[in-house]
UniProtKB/Swiss-Prot annotation:
Comp. bias intervals (Basic and acidic residues): 8-17
GO CC annotation, single: cytoplasm
Classification via Pfam families: FtsJ
Compartment(s) where it occurs, according to its Swiss-Prot or TrEMBL record: Cytoplasm
Similarity annotation: Belongs to the class I-like SAM-binding methyltransferase superfamily. RNA methyltransferase RlmE family.
Top-level taxon of the source organism: Bacteria
InterPro entries: RNA_methyltr_RlmE, RNA_MeTrfase_FtsJ_dom, rRNA-MeTfrase_E, SAM-dependent_MTases_sf
Function statement: Specifically methylates the uridine in position 2552 of 23S rRNA at the 2'-O position of the ribose in the fully assembled 50S ribosomal subunit.
Name of the protein: Ribosomal RNA large subunit methyltransferase E
Disulfide bonds: none
Key words of the record: Cytoplasm, Methyltransferase, rRNA processing, S-adenosyl-L-methionine, Transferase
Binding positions (S-adenosyl-L-methionine): 80, 82, 108, 124, 153
Length: 247
């Protein structure tokens, strides 16, 4: 999810009427790397909408996050690669088309093409009325369903001003943590995307204060030249508890 949609380097090259020579080189290099990226090719082969699916796949396979019957909330779900991966994990082997052993709810400001079995809410996660829609989606005849797993690929539109960008990133992660505290099962898990830099240590401290186990991860599908990383928090805890790291 992009809180304010931001252009990719490809979009910038296409939409900008004037591109500097240096900018053209950067965009050409990005396009070359993207086209030849093994995860891009694998995503196309396996039917995923984005290479990001393999980031979640590695995290899941390393930590065993997704289990049959789980209720999963995907924050920043567009274009849908993470929801696709969860959808496949929750489909029983040999199941008929459309059969799903669990629940998946995606949320994003941007529209998302439908995925069978995935409920989607379009809206800004920061807005109370959008959170209310998410609450309603979790409601059943027996009351509110507690969530097993919250996955967040939310990211703000970066301005290039480090202090402002850091504050936006911190705010989104704080909202994801607050949602997990309010709607997740005590033994549930939260996975968030964030970036090394200003505000990173603050978010690690927040996770340590909130979860029994905290694990920073940089999946192989995250580009090596990117500051992107992920934090995994397992098991909600009381503030007084200490937090070990996963080995």
């Amino acid at each position: 999810m992009k809180v304010n949609p931001k252009n990719s380097p490809k979009d910038n090259l296409k939409d900008s009427p004037k591109v500097s020579a240096r900018g053209k080189k950067v965009n050409k290099a990005w396009l070359h790397d993207h086209i030849n990226d093994p995860y891009v090719k694998l995503a196309q082969k396996e039917g995923y909408r984005a290479r990001a699916a393999y980031k979640l796949k590695e995290i899941d396979e390393t930590l065993g996050l997704i289990k049959p019957g789980d209720c999963v909330v995907d924050l920043g779900s567009t274009p849908g690669a993470w929801s696709q991966y969860v959808r496949r994990k929750l489909s029983p082997t040999g199941a008929a088309a459309g059969e799903l052993n669990g629940r998946i709810i995606g949320l994003d400001m941007l529209p998302m093409e439908p995925i069978e079995g995935v409920a989607f809410i379009q809206g800004d996660f920061r807005e109370p009325e959008v959170l209310q829609k998410l609450e309603q989606a979790l409601a059943t005849d027996k009351g509110q369903v507690k969530v097993d797993l919250v996955i967040s690929d939310m990211a703000p539109n970066l301005s290039g001003i480090e202090s402002a960008d850091a504050a936006r990133i911190v705010h989104l992660v704080e909202l994801a943590v607050e949602f997990a505290q309010n709607r997740m099962k005590p033994d549930g898990t939260l996975v968030v995307k964030l970036f090394h830099g200003s505000g990173y240590d603050e978010l690690v401290k927040l996770f340590r204060a909130t979860f029994k186990v905290v694990k920073p991860m940089k999946p192989k599908a995250s580009r090596s030249n990117s500051s992107e990383t992920f934090l995994v928090g397992k098991g909600l805890k009381k503030r007084a508890e200490t937090v070990p790291e996963l080995a």
